Amino acid sequence: MINAAQNVLSDENNQIGLIYRAQSPYQMAWREWSDIPTVDKRNGVFSDYGVLELIDELKDSKVIINNSNYYIEPTRAFVAIDVNTGGDMSFAAGLKANLAMAKDLPRQLRLRGLGGQVVIDPAPMSRQNRKTLENAIKSSLRRDTIETNFVGWTSMGLIELQRARIRPNWLTL
């Protein structure tokens, strides 16, 4: 095939023509795309690439980020998220934990297939930092592929989100 193409290119009259016609699109695809990517068919590929560990992490409601963690608990009415700072109870640690959660939250909700009303109980922080956290959450939600609206703050200091339900919760499958 390559020799035929080189002969056509070296032709002096430079007329455009058909080199070889395929009998079907299937045969043409095999001829044109003969470099087949290798497929790993070994047993245990999921464990080799860490997929099983990621699935185990999704089964647990606890998500560990930096020196803090947060819990994602789906209920019948809404998805509850509780952010914790660990041992450090300072407002700075609370803000740091909340910002880390804001960055990771869309990914966790997407992987778990969670949607509907989402209520976040942020770690303790000063009222002046609410706008910072709100902007961080909105920024990370804008980068997500699933439509999520920041509804606002409740009088109790909780954050409300409304997220589109794209697929069922993966734990119910």
Predicted ranges, named:
Residues 1-77:
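Extended, charged alpha/beta regions that create polyanion-binding interfaces
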